Amino acid sequence: MTEPRAWFLAGTDTEIGKTFVACALLHAARRDGRSALGMKPVAAGAEWIAGEWLNEDAAQLRAASSFDPGLDRLNPYCLKTPVAPHIAAAEEGVEIDPARIRAAFESLRAQADVVIVEGVGGFRVPLGDRYDTADLARELGLPVILVVGMRLGCISHALLTVEAIAARGLTLAGWIANRIDPAMLRADENLEALRRRIDAPLLGVVPHVAGADPAQVAASLRLPG
């Protein structure tokens, strides 16, 4: 096994395709002959399936991983209600413990060449009264890959997120443009504006293809380095 490498995958917003991109990156790593595991530290919204509470994002990451490391490590906190995690956690009487997440992450990192840790929602989503996903990325000490959902308003969202990443002392390892809105006007011009303003490599552009599979899209992406 090569030296383990891991990244924190953040997004400019919710519903911009982070999980799809995370799965594609896992497939890209596996295509290059590396073992790869996905992780969703906190997920909100789950269904009772085959005797376990299962979040859809976590299920997709598990399917794209080289092997199943167990949901207790892949998704340490699976909250049932599809609302902001700190609200769901409070309603369910759950306190999100960063130490538990870190232990699960270290277990994954010891088992694979590549670990992709997917955040929840945008970059700064509360996980408790004084703890958010940006704090989690900093605590894990991971460089960040930013997924930009290409739609109207994405330039401001992306640049503000880039500033927030830098403000936390984190490294932006690269960014990925996800064409989530096929009707977006001047999409290429928006992409070029982002390319000129983000001081990090563009790791790929995910095309908008109905019914696309992450394994197919993997060819359009690369991991940093």
Curated annotation (Swiss-Prot):
UniProt-listed CDD domains: DTBS
Positions annotated to bind ATP: 15-20, 57, 118-121, 178-179, 207-209
Keyword Magnesium: yes
Reactions mediated catalytically: (7R,8S)-7,8-diammoniononanoate + CO2 + ATP = (4R,5S)-dethiobiotin + ADP + phosphate + 3 H(+)
InterPro entries, sorted: DTB_synth_BioD, P-loop_NTPase
GO biological process, one term: biotin biosynthetic process
Entry annotation: catalytic residues: 40
Coiled-coil residue windows: none
GO cellular component: cytosol
Listed EC numbers: 6.3.3.3
UniProt main location, coarse: cytoplasm
Gene3D superfamilies in the record: P-loop containing nucleotide triphosphate hydrolases
Keyword field: ATP-binding, Biotin biosynthesis, Cytoplasm, Ligase, Magnesium, Metal-binding, Nucleotide-binding
Protein purpose: Catalyzes a mechanistically unusual reaction, the ATP-dependent insertion of CO2 between the N7 and N8 nitrogen atoms of 7,8-diaminopelargonic acid (DAPA, also called 7,8-diammoniononanoate) to form a ureido ring.
Binding partners and assembly: Homodimer.
Similarity annotation: Belongs to the dethiobiotin synthetase family.
Protein name: ATP-dependent dethiobiotin synthetase BioD
Organism in which the protein naturally occurs: Aromatoleum aromaticum (strain DSM 19018 / LMG 30748 / EbN1)
